[in-house]
Swiss-Prot record:
Catalytic reaction list: Hydrolysis of proteins to small peptides in the presence of ATP and magnesium. alpha-casein is the usual test substrate. In the absence of ATP, only oligopeptides shorter than five residues are hydrolyzed (such as succinyl-Leu-Tyr-|-NHMec, and Leu-Tyr-Leu-|-Tyr-Trp, in which cleavage of the -Tyr-|-Leu- and -Tyr-|-Trp bonds also occurs)
Assembly behavior: Fourteen ClpP subunits assemble into 2 heptameric rings which stack back to back to give a disk-like structure with a central cavity, resembling the structure of eukaryotic proteasomes.
Name of the protein: ATP-dependent Clp protease proteolytic subunit 2
Gene that this polypeptide is encoded by: clpP2
Keyword annotations of the record: Cytoplasm, Hydrolase, Protease, Serine protease
Single biological process term from Gene Ontology: protein quality control for misfolded or incompletely synthesized proteins
Domain of life of the organism encoding this protein: Bacteria
A Pfam family of this chain: CLP_protease
Organism: Synechococcus sp. (strain JA-2-3B'a(2-13))
Length: 200
């Protein structure tokens, strides 16, 4: 069930679902596994907010166990493509593709709350079918792994060799460890102002 917010104005009352209301303050939520549906929704919201004001920051809150690499890359590429800075904020868990999107936010504006957890690892694969198809899928997984590792190295400033080593298995971090690693820039507990768009 999605809560509804009632707003009053001179023209009367208007009801919003909570996510639509937050979108007015340029806040987007990724609170599920990353799949094509949620990626399309987030991409559409980012493009809409860019058209509304290309100079104002967008705030992407992330609480996600990860999911589809292809869907995640659609979100990531849009984050890099649009004009507004995208501030990423980890609440709860940012794992796998969730952690990758967290790191892909605008440098200096990647944030985690104090009790969040961040996890990086290599892409998961489960190839089945004829041997030739398995070979094709194996090559694709290696390509994805190398691409993600290279981008993580770019966003964190870590050497590629360390990224490859550290993503070989599930690698959980506290916010402080993620900051030291370069996945985020700040650990905060309170926003500086009591407004929805105060995180910066």
């Amino acid at each position: 069930m999605i809560p509804t917010v009632i707003e009053q104005s001179a023209r009367g009352e208007r009801a919003f679902d909570i996510y639509s209301r937050l979108l007015r303050d340029r806040i987007i939520f990724l609170g599920t596994q990353v799949d094509d549906d949620i990626a399309n929704l987030i991409v559409a919201q980012m493009l809409y907010l860019e058209s509304e004001d290309p100079e104002k920051d967008i705030y992407l809150y992330i609480n996600s166990p990860g999911g589809s690499v292809y869907a995640g890359m659609a979100i990531y590429d849009t984050m890099q493509h649009i004009q507004p800075d995208v501030s990423t904020i980890c609440i709860g868990l940012a794992a796998s593709m969730g952690a990758f999107l967290l790191a892909g936010g605008t440098k200096g504006k990647r944030i985690a709350l104090p009790h969040a957890r961040i996890m990086i690892h290599q892409p998961l694969g489960g190839a089945q079918g004829p041997a030739t198809d398995i070979e094709i899928q194996a090559k694709e997984i290696l390509f994805i792994k190398n691409s993600l590792n290279s981008l993580l190295a770019y966003h964190t400033g870590q050497p590629l060799e360390r990224i490859e080593r550290d993503t070989d298995r599930d690698n959980f971090m506290t916010p402080e460890q993620a900051k030291e690693y370069g996945l985020i820039d700040q650990v905060i507990s309170k926003r500086p102002q009591p407004t929805l768009a105060a995180v910066s």
